[in-house]
Amino acid sequence: MAAQAPVDEIAQLSVSDAATTKPKPGLDSATATNGNLNRDSDDSDDDAENAAPGAETGAAKKKKKRKPKKKKKNPTAQSDPPRVLISQLFPDKVYPKGEEVEYVNENRYRTTNEEKRHLDNLKNDFYNDYRHAAEAHRQTRQWAQKNIKPGWSLTDIANGIEDSVRALVGHQGLEEGDALKAGMGFPTGLSLNHCAAHYNPNAGNKMVLQQDDVLKVDIGVHVNGNIVDSAFTLAFNPRYDPLLEACKAATNEGLKQAGIDARLGEIGGYIQEVMESYEVELDGNTYQVKPIRNLNGHTILPYNIHGGKSVPIVKSNDQTKMEEGDVFAIETFGSTGNGYVHEEGEISHYAKRMDAPKVDLRLSSAKSLLNVINKNFGTLPFCRRYLDRLGQDKYLLGLNSLVANGVVESYPPLVDKKGSYTAQFEHTILIRPTVKEVISRGDDY
């Protein structure tokens, strides 16, 4: 989820009521059966068979031996759409590691140092939660990349992704507190074309994906508050391929430069150099790919998607260093436009502020809604569809009040100039004592 560079003023919240739409059949949150898996079933037999002809009346009936019940095996493959629990696919509850990369130069010793390895082992549960979330992310996005096509509505895409995430981690988030255990780390970002980030369809949204669209898909998955933040871009017209390649290469460069004692401003310079080496030809015009300079990567803290450190994607004088134990989202945004975004459009993303003040709320609807937010999301970002899903209605006045009182932060869509195209790629990386681990790395990107 994008971190916006600080601005002097926040755009005024603008929201509107809309009716809830029903998701496309087959994308609901009910657990689906994996039709590709062989399941063992119990044999059923008659308790007894009739006496043989000629047998004496009252003779004891012969009984067949009851066969022992066969134990049902754990699934060995994922269903389509994904509904098999990740914990069933990995019954030992040890989840796959991400891409481990050894440190270089003065930090090379860390890979084999006994003290650092001991420190690493102390955080195995923390790492395993992250790997659990990362595996759910990989399997969800694999389905999304395979199935999302022009003609799908953004609402169906969002429901398909979010239903999959909840099913894979085993928490539907409909009971009080359930979504705080595992599930969505933030609302799925589905930002089209010149919109770079923070767009998610509200109820009643009728937008449909078109053949010439460039779609940023930003998915957050958490387990026990440990959030994997990773994004990719889909384009169905090959003319946008260089734009996507620029962002993917720039993100990989940022990951390469990341590590203990790496200076954030210098990482931004490396990212910028790679990004600007790409060009895109559209309608006879050639555009240098520009990094969107007021969007940044960021640290991730438990239940807090935007920690205190920012990773610029252009060179800066920021001398802040990455440190052992940090978790970073390394993300880059490229644009054929101005390379600068502003807030515009209907708001869908919100989050309770970590430093939310204690305010005497006058509106009863605001008090009631804050109670719902505390019990279901805490400080995790949420969207209006998530409130709809919990059965909340007529909450906009209360939500506006919470925003106005500084209790809840709103995140409007972030857009470059109209007619331009933007792309995004992002990974989450753990700065471990011994190695750096790109926790969300997959075969796709």
From Swiss-Prot:
PANTHER family per record: METHIONINE AMINOPEPTIDASE 2
BP GO annotations: proteolysis
Upper classification of the organism: Eukaryota, Fungi, Dikarya, Ascomycota, Pezizomycotina
Protein name (database record): Methionine aminopeptidase 2
Molecular functions (GO terms): initiator methionyl aminopeptidase activity; metal ion binding; metalloaminopeptidase activity
Pfam families reported in the protein's UniProt record: Peptidase_M24
Free-text function comment from the UniProt entry: Cotranslationally removes the N-terminal methionine from nascent proteins. The N-terminal methionine is often cleaved when the second residue in the primary sequence is small and uncharged (Met-Ala-, Cys, Gly, Pro, Ser, Thr, or Val).
Location (main, coarse): cytoplasm
Domain of life according to the entry: Eukaryota
Cofactor: Co(2+); Zn(2+); Mn(2+); Fe(2+)
Family named by the database record: Belongs to the peptidase M24A family. Methionine aminopeptidase eukaryotic type 2 subfamily.
InterPro entries: Creatinase/aminopeptidase-like, Met_Aminopeptidase_Type2, Pept_M24, Pept_M24_MAP, Pept_M24A_MAP2, Pept_M24A_MAP2_BS, WH-like_DNA-bd_sf, WH_DNA-bd_sf
Entries under HAMAP family matching the protein: MetAP_2_euk
A GO CC term assigned to this protein in UniProt: cytoplasm
Location of the region described as Disordered in the Swiss-Prot/TrEMBL record: 1-89
Chain positions recorded as substrate binding sites: 198, 306
Enzyme Commission designation: 3.4.11.18
Cofactor binding, note field: Binds 2 divalent metal cations per subunit. Has a high-affinity and a low affinity metal-binding site. The true nature of the physiological cofactor is under debate. The enzyme is active with cobalt, zinc, manganese or divalent iron ions. Most likely, methionine aminopeptidases function as mononuclear Fe(2+)-metalloproteases under physiological conditions, and the catalytically relevant metal-binding site has been assigned to the histidine-containing high-affinity site.
